Structures are given as C-alpha cells and as structure tokens.
C-alpha cells in the first residue's frame, strides 16, 4: 500500500489548482515511514486523493508532486514520457533559431520537479536539486543515454539549494566521453563558448538568449557598457550588430578570458572592446564621479535575494545600481536592466527602476518588458517559474 501524506483541513486548495509543492506546515499526518525521495500519495483531510510525489524529509517543501493523475505510476516509463514531452516542446524553437544550446527540462514547469537539464551541443548537463530527483538519477541517465546516444551526460548538482534537501553537492561525468572544454554552441547565428565544468549554473545563461537579440537592436554606432558581463555575450551580440565601442565588466578574470574567446570564435575584432575586471558597483560610482557616459548600458547582476528576508535589501541594491546607471546614460540612451530573483515581482521591479530614475533626476520611458527565453517555460500552476524580469528603458 502506498505511503500516504494527509493534509491539514483547507490546505488542499493549492494542489487542487495543480501547484506541485506541499510545505511541511500543511501536513497533518503521515501513514507509513517514507525514505528520502520515495514516492508518496497526498490526500486532503477528508481523504480524497490529490497527487503523487517525492518525499523530502529535511526540506521545507516536503513533497514535490510528480503527477496529478491517480492512474499514473512513477516509474521508468513516467520519466521517459516526461523527457519526450519536454523535447517536443523545444523542437519548434530549435528549428526556428538553429539552436545547439537550450534548456531541455525546466524542472517544475516541465512536470519534473527538481530536475534541470541543459543541452550544449553534444553535452547534456543535469542539475538534480531534490531528493526525488536524486533518487531517480540512474533512471534519468539511462533514458537520456537512450534518447540522445551521441551526447555525453555531465552532472552539475553543486548548488546551495541541495543543502535544504539534506543533500551534498555532486558533480562529474555520468555517461559518455566529455569533449574538451569549452563546448561551442550556436544561437541566432552566433557561436558561444561554454565550460560546463567550471562555468556558472550549468555553464551558461541560456535564459537571456532572446534578450541578447533585443539588446542588439539598440547598439549600432553606440557606446555600450555591459555590466556583470560573465562571458560577454551581450557585448558579443553588440559587436556583431555594429556597436562603436563596448566595455565588458566582470569580477572574474576567467569569465573575461572567455569573453575574449567568444569574439575570436566569431571572427570579430575586439579592437573596440575593453575588458574590465572590476566590481561593478564601485566602477559605476567612479565613472559617475569622472563624468563618463554611455549610449547603452546592460545591467545583468547575480541574484540579490535568495529568500524573503533578503528582499528589502535586494530592493535597495537594485535601486542603487539602476540609479547610478541612469546617471551615466547619454540623453536618449537605453538601459537594459534585469533581476533574476524569483522573489522579485515584475511590477515591483519596474517601480524600483522608476524610483531610481526619480533619484537620478532622469525622465525615462519603459520600451519593453523582458522575460526568460521560451525554452524556460512558466507552468500555469507554477508562477515561481517566472523568475527572470527585465526592462528596456530610454532615458532623457
């Protein structure tokens, strides 16, 4: 008989709307003794069945729902179906944009909580972020090896969120032979070098693909300041689009070295590109004091808030950096600014940038709202999947 998790009265509403998380404070009792990652059934307080998911005893999210179909068993065939569905959902995008790098599985938004899989040419990179995902590792590797026989499979489960599940970090080759790093992927006709072993996240920020192309519309014959540039891909797009000058800024010398490589891989001269290993906050203040200005500024900072307690501080950080950036823009200049903090609502982020403009004594117009690329879908019952927010603002 299946292990059963009974919820407290009234706590079934989110599951009835197909949200895939059950928090520890929603649980009334447990029938059985589930092991970490084991499949459990979740029922309402009156006993009616709600969903079937993975047990995470050390997490605040104690059950992540695999399925809301009572007839669907969680077995090898289940994961095969979900992986195939995820690939089908990307096929049109791959054909349209000629992608060789894309997100294959976007965790909860693809019905596979805790499982992220990115494809970089012939390398699949997996992040397994929950006990349920961890338990099914071998099955996932077998299925991926069958469905993608030409691909190596590498694990990058080295993120802090695993600690909340009571899991240790795991990295390493799971299947096949890893090619020499970096791997070269292609998007929108541009080649990008990706190091899946040492790079951020799974190696690269695939979610900004569409926004890189949008940024390129504003840069011809313009001066561009690319902040928190990582491997310089906003600057790379700008170079190909005819920017007059580009400054790529990051604290990582390794990232900047890859930014140089990206220019070379695309056969582009970097005579008009400056690579600046610096703290962005300090550099922007210095440039303001020196009276330096730019036509286009990209702000793509790391996550400022990992939890609700950090949100107020994140708001102050976003306001400060956007205020200084706006002070550095020439009249008619364009700011592309982003937040990758899932806890930051899009409307609040826009208000922060508007308030920053007031403090900077600049009039701005919001031209576009931006989000993550379409291979990072947002499940209709999982608003948390909408994490990347961006704005394009013109300053006067």
UniProtKB/Swiss-Prot annotation:
<comment type="function">
    <text>Specifically methylates the cytosine at position 1962 (m5C1962) of 23S rRNA.</text>
</comment>
<feature type="domain" description="PUA">
    <location>
        <begin position="2"/>
        <end position="79"/>
    </location>
</feature>
<dbReference type="InterPro" id="IPR019614">
    <property type="entry name" value="SAM-dep_methyl-trfase"/>
</dbReference>
<dbReference type="Pfam" id="PF10672">
    <property type="entry name" value="Methyltrans_SAM"/>
</dbReference>
<dbReference type="InterPro" id="IPR023542">
    <property type="entry name" value="RLMI"/>
</dbReference>
<dbReference type="GO" id="GO:0003723">
    <property type="term" value="F:RNA binding"/>
</dbReference>
<dbReference type="GO" id="GO:0016434">
    <property type="term" value="F:rRNA (cytosine) methyltransferase activity"/>
</dbReference>
<dbReference type="GO" id="GO:0005737">
    <property type="term" value="C:cytoplasm"/>
</dbReference>
<keyword id="KW-0808">Transferase</keyword>
<keyword id="KW-0949">S-adenosyl-L-methionine</keyword>
<keyword id="KW-0489">Methyltransferase</keyword>
<protein>
    <recommendedName>
        <fullName>Ribosomal RNA large subunit methyltransferase I</fullName>
        <ecNumber>2.1.1.191</ecNumber>
    </recommendedName>
</protein>
<comment type="similarity">
    <text>Belongs to the methyltransferase superfamily. RlmI family.</text>
</comment>
<dbReference type="Pfam" id="PF17785">
    <property type="entry name" value="PUA_3"/>
</dbReference>
<dbReference type="InterPro" id="IPR015947">
    <property type="entry name" value="PUA-like_sf"/>
</dbReference>
<dbReference type="InterPro" id="IPR036974">
    <property type="entry name" value="PUA_sf"/>
</dbReference>
<dbReference type="InterPro" id="IPR029063">
    <property type="entry name" value="SAM-dependent_MTases_sf"/>
</dbReference>
<dbReference type="InterPro" id="IPR002478">
    <property type="entry name" value="PUA"/>
</dbReference>
<keyword id="KW-0963">Cytoplasm</keyword>
<keyword id="KW-0698">rRNA processing</keyword>
<keyword id="KW-0694">RNA-binding</keyword>
<dbReference type="InterPro" id="IPR041532">
    <property type="entry name" value="RlmI-like_PUA"/>
</dbReference>
């Amino acid at each position: 008989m299946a292990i059963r998790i009974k919820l407290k009265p009234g706590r079934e509403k989110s599951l009835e709307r197909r949200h895939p998380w059950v928090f520890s404070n929603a649980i009334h009792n447990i029938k059985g003794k589930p092991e970490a990652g084991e499949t459990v059934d979740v029922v309402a307080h009156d006993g009616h069945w709600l969903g079937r998911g993975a047990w995470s005893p050390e997490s605040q999210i104690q059950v992540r729902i695999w399925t809301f179909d009572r007839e669907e068993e969680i077995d090898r065939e289940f994961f095969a179906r979900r992986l195939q569905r995820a690939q089908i959902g990307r096929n049109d995008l791959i054909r349209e944009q000629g992608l060789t790098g894309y997100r294959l599985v976007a965790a909860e938004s693809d019905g596979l909580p805790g499982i992220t899989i990115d494809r970089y040419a012939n390398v699949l990179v997996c992040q397994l972020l929950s006990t349920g995902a961890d338990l099914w590792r071998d099955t996932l590797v077998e299925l991926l090896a069958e469905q993608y026989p030409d691909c190596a499979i590498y694990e990058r489960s080295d993120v802090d969120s695993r600690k909340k599940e009571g899991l240790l970090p795991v990295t390493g080759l799971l299947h096949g032979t890893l090619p020499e790093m970096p791997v070269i992927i292609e998007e929108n006709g541009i080649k990008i070098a990706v190091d899946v072993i040492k790079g951020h996240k799974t190696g690269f920020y695939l979610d900004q693909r569409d926004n890189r192309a949008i940024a390129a519309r504003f840069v011809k014959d313009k001066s561009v300041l690319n902040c928190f540039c990582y491997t310089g891909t906003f600057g790379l797009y700008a170079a190909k689009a005819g920017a007059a000058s580009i400054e790529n800024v990051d604290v990582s010398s390794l990232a900047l070295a890859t930014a140089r490589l990206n220019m070379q891989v695309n056969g582009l001269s970097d005579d008009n590109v400056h690579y600046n290993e610096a703290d962005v906050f300090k550099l922007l203040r210095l440039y303001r004091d020196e009276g330096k200005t730019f036509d286009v500024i990209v702000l793509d900072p790391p996550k400022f808030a990992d939890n609700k307690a950090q949100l107020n501080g994140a708001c102050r950080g976003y306001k400060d950096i956007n205020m200084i950036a706006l002070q550095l823009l020439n009249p008619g200049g364009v700011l592309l600014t982003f937040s990758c903090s899932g806890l930051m609502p899009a409307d609040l982020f826009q208000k922060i940038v508007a308030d920053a403009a007031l403090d900077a004594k600049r009039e701005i117009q919001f031209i576009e709202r931006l989000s993550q690329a379409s291979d990072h879908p947002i499940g209709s019952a999982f608003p948390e999947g909408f994490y990347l927010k961006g704005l394009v603002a013109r300053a006067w």
